[in-house]
Amino acid sequence: MLILQAGGTITTRDAAGRLIPALSPRTGEAGQASASALRFYTEFADPSKEDYTWNRARAEAMKAFASGDLALYIGYASEQPLLSRMNPNLNYAIASVPQIRNAARTINGGRAYAFATPRTTKNPVGAVTVAYLLSTAESSQALAQALGIPSARRDILNQPVTGYDELFNKQAIIARAWLDPDPKKTESIFQAMIENTTSGTLLLTEAITRADQEMGQILGL
């Protein structure tokens, strides 16, 4: 999300329509979104910085927040029920995600899932029909209510709601995302990029370049 707020992205499409990594600027491109975001993020793990608040000895963020040892946790709306189960007595409030000062536009991060029909499916018409029915306004609203998450449809998000659902819906409207080729592998890539930076194993720009190259390998480039 920090990279998106800084004006960058993680993957994009080239002139031929292929999905390619975009962590590192290509030849002739300007922009330091990835570097700015990674620098900001990793400074919290740098003992020489005033913002130093994290090290490997600390618990995972959600667990620390649920136990009352962390004052601020940035997560997804879908995590609210889990937090309540982890600590039913936790007293907390939910607010919109912080933004970069003087940013041109407000950006939030979100996870979006889509239906896809394999080319080898034996019943393509049936598969497309099911996908269509599940994406209707009625189905989308029912799924959102059942799962406790915002709908992916703007017409549903614009309907009047109460409580935190109003905040969640507003945040969903400004949410931005990127095409993730393999969530588990990309999570490992980002973790390695962060650890390579905080440990001093690689320079910040080198860590980004390596992550960009590893992302390219996932995409078969």
Predicted regions and their residues:
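Ligand-binding "clamshell"
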Residues: 5-8, 83-102
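Glycine-centered hinge/linker elements that transmit conformational signals in sensory
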Residues: 14-54
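Short amphipathic alpha-helical coupling segments at ligand-binding clamshell hinges
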Residues: 33-40, 122-134, 142-143, 203, ...
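A bilobed periplasmic-binding-protein/Venus flytrap-type ligand-binding module shared by bacterial periplasmic
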Residues: 110-122
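Extracytoplasmic/periplasmic solute-binding protein
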Residues: 1-25, 70
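Paired acidic/hydrophobic, glycine-rich loop segments that form the ligand-binding mouth/hinge
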Residues: 71-76, 93
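Long, aromatic- and glycine/proline-rich binding clefts that accommodate carbohydrate-like moieties
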Residues: 88, 95, 143-196, 221
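Short helix-initiation/N-cap motifs at beta->coil->alpha
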Residues: 51-66
